[in-house]
């Protein structure tokens, strides 16, 4: 555990030195506080026989969308250092596991090894840490963070259609959509907000007139359908 924590602290302090915002004394004080805090945190969550166990607990994560890592925040407070002065990347993840320390810059880059203590690899730890710092710096400038990726990848303009008779022409879509403010607002109505419905209109019809016989009409008995008998004669 001692070697893994030392490699982690050296890696972070080398990144801080590249930022050139803190004095040598402040960097050394921050490194000492960070080492002490990591020892206190990892001593009950270190499993050499199963390195992946407790990996999430030992992970050091920096992300603008999440709260600041508790260990880094406390190390800054106890060393009287502003976290922003460290110059660490906006997104970075460090896995401190038995026999190996890995890092990833951003969310889209591949992880890389900071230091490995498996067999003879431990003898090359200082060189590997230095190479990891250089690789991390290059990945930081070339990688894309999760909050910087464009959310809309659709084309902004509609491509032209070669067929002149096609209804899908670019000119049909260039007119601006009218704003809703150009239309009159809906009137408010009383009585629970519902407007009075007008009564249906039906055209007036002429009243039916019953047929009346005129005075000149014969009132006598009918001989047949074509002849009437006048009884007054």
Swiss-Prot record:
It comes from Xenopus laevis. One of its GO terms (cellular component) is cytoplasm. This is Maternal B9.15 protein. Residues 135-165 are annotated as: Disordered. Belongs to the BTG family.
């Amino acid at each position: 555990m001692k070697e893994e924590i030392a490699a982690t602290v050296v890696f972070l302090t080398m990144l801080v030195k590249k930022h050139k915002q803190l004095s040598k004394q402040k960097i050394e004080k921050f490194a000492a506080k960070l080492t002490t805090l990591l020892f206190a945190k990892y001593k009950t969550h270190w499993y050499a026989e199963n390195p992946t166990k407790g990996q999430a607990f030992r992970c050091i994560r920096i992300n603008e969308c999440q709260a600041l890592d508790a260990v880094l925040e406390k190390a800054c407070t106890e060393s009287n250092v502003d976290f922003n002065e460290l110059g660490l990347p906006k997104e970075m993840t460090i896995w401190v596991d038995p026999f190996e320390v890995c890092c990833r810059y951003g969310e889209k880059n591949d992880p890389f090894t900071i230091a490995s203590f498996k067999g003879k690899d431990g003898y090359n730890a200082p060189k590997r840490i230095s190479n990891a710092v250089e690789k991390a710096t290059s990945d930081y400038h070339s990688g894309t963070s999760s909050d910087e990726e464009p959310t809309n990848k659709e084309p902004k303009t509609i491509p032209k259609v070669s067929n002149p008779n096609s209804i899908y022409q670019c000119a049909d879509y260039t007119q601006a959509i009218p704003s809703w403010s150009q239309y009159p607002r809906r009137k408010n109505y009383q009585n629970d907000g519902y407007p009075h419905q007008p009564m249906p209109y039906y055209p007036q019809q002429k009243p039916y007139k019953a047929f009346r016989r005129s005075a000149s009409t014969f009132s006598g008995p009918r001989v047949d359908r074509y002849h009437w008998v006048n009884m007054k004669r």
